[in-house]
Amino acid sequence: MQKSQKIAIVGSGLVGSLLAIYLKKEGHTVHVYDRSPDIRTIQFSGRSINLAMSNRGWNALDGAGVGDKVRHIAIAMEKRAIHIGNQLNFQHYGLQGECIYSISRGVLNRKMIDLAEEAGAEFFFEQKIWDVNLTDATLQMGETERGEWTNVSYDMVFGADGAFSRIRHRMQRQSMFNYSQDFLNTGYKELHIPANPDGSYKLDKHSLHIWPRGKYMLIALPNLDGSFTCTLFMPFEGENSFASLDNRQKVEAFFAENLPDTVDVIPDLAEDFFKNPTSTLVTMKCFPWTYSDKVALIGDAAHAIVPFYGQGMNAGFEDITILYQMMQEYGNDWKTIFSEYEKSRKPDADAIAELSYRNFMEMSTKTANEKFLLQKKIERWFASKYPEKWIPLYDRVTFSTRPYSEALAIGDFQETIMQEILKIENIETNWETEEIEHKIIQLLNSK
């Protein structure tokens, strides 16, 4: 156990709450601040994308000893359900029957705060942090940005306050601090499929449902109460955009024409559409993530990504796993802990940002593409015969804890092989053959 420190975490979201549990485990005094009210006392906002928990997330929760306390609020999704026209195609996720798990962000956040409080962390809600003194880890808080501030000193401060982090904003004022943000021209809006009157599900419960339509798409993830949380991803401007759907008639006509099998299962479509906000999607990168042994960024505050690999929360939780490994290795040397944490984690954060953006293209356009579906079939077939030679990219990202940067590099190599295979004459009918098997092995050995 480390020497006890007085530590502040800014941000009571998923990453901040789990970090609090890990730090309490090491005997530290932990205070968690958030400018928002306690989420346990308020209604959900209608702008949340359901979470897809996978191996990296469970690994971090289990490391804190709380995984089993979360599993009962998660629903296993073993496959994608692809809705194209009136057809429904299923794509199973893992080679060995692995699943990802749907969890409501609000339900999980409430649970994580409860668990952090049980571990001994103290939470302070509706506390606005305006600045932090980097050299002595002093938080400056007050009612307004230009009003009177109160200073509260700590041994160290963690910024877990999201993509638009106040703590990172302070670090950006340093020399040699690199920062970039990139918004997609696509936004998102939450919609809702209620349960049947008897509480049963209107769609297959154990699937992540996708309606791929090129520049826009709809996804739906199951909730415990029989409902689904849907997210419509769509350009802000242009044809088939949020701007073009500006009245009830246009929304209803658009869904009837383009997403006809959703009309009967989303009874409050127009109400949801105009009541719920249209939100932005941003990739944010920065470096360094730490200042001496005093301040560190973690989760979205260090690396916000778009949600198309279902890895935002998983990556944030894995930050904590890596930080905790450094704590075990370097004891009370927080300067080295912080330095090794950011050095180890930055390449993987960049890799999952790239993979998430690419998966947006895959989910919205390629899942309806016959050549792409054939490629996935060939990969699965070969991987099932040679699991030691070929782990598909999705499985490397989702069902392992190997570095994201490794998954990206190997995935790129596998993609070059598959593009060669798809050029072979009559591949559509001759892919399950020894000839193709040997060709893939030959290409693998050419590296």
UniProtKB/Swiss-Prot annotation:
Pfam families cross-referenced by the UniProt entry: FAD_binding_3
Superkingdom of the organism of origin: Bacteria
Cofactor: FAD
Pathway this chain belongs to: Cofactor biosynthesis; NAD(+) biosynthesis; quinolinate from L-kynurenine: step 1/3
Keywords attached to this entry: FAD, Flavoprotein, Monooxygenase, NADP, Oxidoreductase, Pyridine nucleotide biosynthesis
Top enzyme class: oxidoreductase
Reactions this protein catalyses: L-kynurenine + NADPH + O2 + H(+) = 3-hydroxy-L-kynurenine + NADP(+) + H2O
UniProt-recorded Gene Ontology molecular function terms: FAD binding; kynurenine 3-monooxygenase activity
Keyword Flavoprotein: yes
One of the protein's GO biological processes: L-tryptophan catabolic process
EC number: 1.14.13.9
Homology family: Belongs to the aromatic-ring hydroxylase family. KMO subfamily.
HAMAP family in the cross-refs: Kynurenine_monooxygenase
Function description: Catalyzes the hydroxylation of L-kynurenine (L-Kyn) to form 3-hydroxy-L-kynurenine (L-3OHKyn). Required for synthesis of quinolinic acid.
Name of the molecule in the record: Kynurenine 3-monooxygenase
Organism, scientific name: Flavobacterium psychrophilum (strain ATCC 49511 / DSM 21280 / CIP 103535 / JIP02/86)
